[in-house]
């Protein structure tokens, strides 16, 4: 029966029973889970034997809101984030932000406009220059708000971040 097959799969592949891997295989989203299963996924990912299989510089973080494609608001995205700093911290943190404002972009979508100090502007320019064509995750309080692809170097210390913000 179908339920017996599901129970067998849960025994043999417990993580796969609660986390659906991203079928595209590209981008920073590695999987999807129903919100009721995210704690279970976190438990599996925290297991020593699972952690040992993952790269040391990999951080797995949930999106802050349900996936855009899910109108019921139940499915959350799990992002794979490469930690580029030796200390495991983000290459840029809030200490370089001099101003951040809630605004609306040219498409009338909520966004955050931010300005950085000189050090932050320099580091942001290097970070964006070195990651053209790749995604840079915007993580606040441990959740991914946005993971846009970088189109080019961003200089001048001013950026606008769009993503899962609510007005």
Regions found by a protein language model. Name each.
Residues 164-167:
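Short, intrinsically disordered, charge-balanced linker/junction segments flanking boundaries
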Residues 1-150, 154-155, 159:
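Non-transmembrane, solvent-exposed regions of membrane trafficking/translocation machinery
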């Amino acid at each position: 029966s179908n339920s017996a097959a599901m129970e067998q799969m849960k025994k043999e592949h417990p993580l796969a029973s609660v986390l659906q891997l991203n079928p595209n295989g590209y981008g920073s989203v590695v999987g999807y889970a129903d919100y009721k299963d995210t704690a279970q996924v976190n438990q599996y990912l925290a297991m020593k034997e699972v952690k040992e299989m993952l790269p040391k510089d990999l951080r797995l973080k949930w999106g802050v809101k349900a996936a855009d494609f899910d109108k019921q608001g139940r499915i959350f995205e799990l992002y794979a984030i490469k930690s580029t700093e030796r200390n495991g911290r983000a290459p840029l943190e809030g200490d370089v932000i001099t101003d951040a404002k809630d605004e609306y972009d040219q498409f009338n979508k909520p966004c955050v406009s931010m300005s950085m100090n000189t050090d932050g502007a320099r580091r942001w320019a290097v970070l964006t220059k070195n990651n053209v064509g790749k995604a840079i995750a915007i993580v606040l309080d441990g959740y991914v708000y946005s993971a846009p692809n970088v189109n080019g170097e961003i200089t001048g210390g001013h950026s606008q971040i769009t993503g899962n913000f609510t007005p």
